[in-house]
UniProtKB/Swiss-Prot annotation:
The keyword Aminoacyl-tRNA synthetase is assigned to this record: no
Catalytic activities: a ribonucleotidyl-ribonucleotide-RNA + H2O = a 3'-end 3'-phospho-ribonucleotide-RNA + a 5'-end dephospho-ribonucleoside-RNA + H(+); an adenylyl-uridine-RNA = a 3'-end 2',3'-cyclophospho-AMP-RNA + a 5'-end dephospho-uridine-RNA; a guanylyl-uridine-RNA = a 3'-end 2',3'-cyclophospho-GMP-RNA + a 5'-end dephospho-uridine-RNA
Sequence similarity: Belongs to the RNase T2 family.
List of catalytic residues: 32, 82, 86
Protein name: Ribonuclease T2
Activity regulation (UniProt): Inhibited by Zn(2+) and Cu(2+).
Main location: secreted
Entry-linked Pfam families: Ribonuclease_T2 (PF00445)
Enzyme Commission code(s) on record: 4.6.1.19
Length: 200
């Protein structure tokens, strides 16, 4: 179960919700998870306990909600899944070896990386005009100094272009940024991409 890197996964709620209906999705990038590469469900006898992250709940609800289901109970199911599948593996690291540390550190990374404000400062905002994938990638490399992984949903019938879905930043085992390896699942094609604005 040895893993080599962590992947900080941000997703864009409008794209997630385009696939399914959501009520009032956040209009900012939220956390999908902090995932060790190449492993899952490392310890089935370490159940998720919401009491351990009580102090983190206000931030969890804001930055790590279950975008598809707005009820708070659903977010607990989502966090349980993330802990059982990914957190139990991440816990190999001292910095992440409890539920409080795993969720707390992920929130810290989210705030430090500040993807939302970074994209805005770069002038990359949700728009009905399209962006070029290469422009988004190069802009992010300029800020973070590493190559991110940008993931898209392919165009559905009637759509002209792919839709921006997730942005991943990769970290070493000592939580330093590193290049994300190419390629991967659902990676974006070169060319135009739609970064969907919130529905009115």
């Amino acid at each position: 179960h040895e893993w080599k890197k962590l992947i900080m996964v941000h997703h864009w709620p409008m794209t997630v919700c385009n696939e399914k209906n959501c009520e009032h999705p956040p209009d900012y990038w939220t956390i999908h998870g902090l995932w060790p590469d190449k492993s899952g469900e490392c310890n089935r006898s370490w159940p998720f306990n919401p009491d351990e992250i009580k102090g983190l709940l206000p931030d969890m609800r804001l930055y790590w909600p279950d975008v598809l289901h707005s009820s708070p109970n659903h977010s607990v199911h989502f966090w349980r899944h993330e802990w059982e599948k990914h957190g139990t593996c991440a816990a190999q690291l001292d910095a992440l070896n409890s539920q409080r540390k795993y969720f707390g550190k992920t929130l810290d990374l989210y705030k430090e990386l500040a993807l939302n404000s970074t994209l805005q400062k770069l002038g990359i905002k949700p728009s009905i005009s399209y962006y070029q994938i290469s422009d988004i990638k190069h802009a992010l490399v300029g800020v973070y100094g590493v190559v991110p992984k940008v993931q898209c949903l392919p165009p559905k019938s009637g759509e002209k272009v792919q839709t921006l879905g997730q942005i991943e930043l990769c970290l070493t085992r000592d939580l330093q940024l590193q290049d994300c390896p190419e390629p991967g699942l659902e990676i974006c094609e070169d060319g135009p991409v739609f970064y969907p604005p919130p529905k009115e």
